Amino acid sequence: MTSRRQPGHARPLSALTEYDMAAFNTERVLSVHHWNDTLFSFTTTRDAALRFHNGHFVMIGLEVEGKPLLRAYSIASANYEENLEFLSIKVQNGPLTSRLQHLKEGDTILVSRKPVGTLVVDDLKPGKHLFLFGTGTGLAPFMSIIKDPDVYERFDKVILVHGVRWVSELAYANYIENELPNNEFFGDVVRDKLVYYPTVTREPFRNQGRITELLENGKLCADIGIPQINPETDRAMICGSPHMLADISAMLDSRGFVVSPGVGQPGDYVVERAFVDK
């Protein structure tokens, strides 16, 4: 997988034909939104028995020639929402994504019945600020997390940092900036605590540069108006390309942060271990 292909949202697994079809629900596509020529999202029905933690992922796919063609996708919808939502890149020759990008309303898709993952708030130690570092479609799990009222009770500030190449790749920007703060149930706390910091690398924008650069030179925290990131007060969640995961993890480690070693073991930051290339 190259750095342009975001983990958690189109990741190949081996021995796909061994999957038991009984482990999947068949869901119906309700809507499809194409953000640009490389990025799209879609919503589906949700089986009433499906339960997950915000930040979890599922296997989704299509039945091709009688066999399931599957990839791991983070769930972009919150665990209390009626439908499921997913964010995906378009890969012209990708075994699954080349087919998924042509989904239309009414089509069916396979969704695994057992969501899993290590990118969950429960595995973070208490802190003051929660940083959500995502690149590309690594935004997906954080969309579910910023819609979780419990997250805002745990932290004074929730800082969503989304790094992309082009402005058109800033999926959900309007929702984050204008719709979520007006949520009828918890919009007031979103307005008070959520900080959205999109940054672009390949064209002019109000914030420019890679996330790692903005952390290392201090610009990100200075722009937000908080002290530089430190393990005494700050917690982090990371989702993106393997290169980005490695870089930010190394930077946090060098500053004294300790990663959660596994499910049920709190740390200063968490990553989705299933998507970290060995």
Predicted segments, located by residue:
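Ser/Thr-glycine-rich phosphate-binding loops at phosphate-binding pockets of nucleotides
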Residues: T135-P141
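Generic structural signal for buried aliphatic residues
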Residues: V58, I109-S112
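Conserved beta-strand elements of the Class I
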Residues: L130-F133, M237
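Short helix-loop-beta connector
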Residues: L124-H129, P231-E232
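Reductase modules of NAD(P)H-dependent flavoproteins
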Residues: R4-G8, Y19-A23, V161, S168-K278
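Histidine-anchored nucleotide/phosphate-binding helix
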Residues: P141-E153
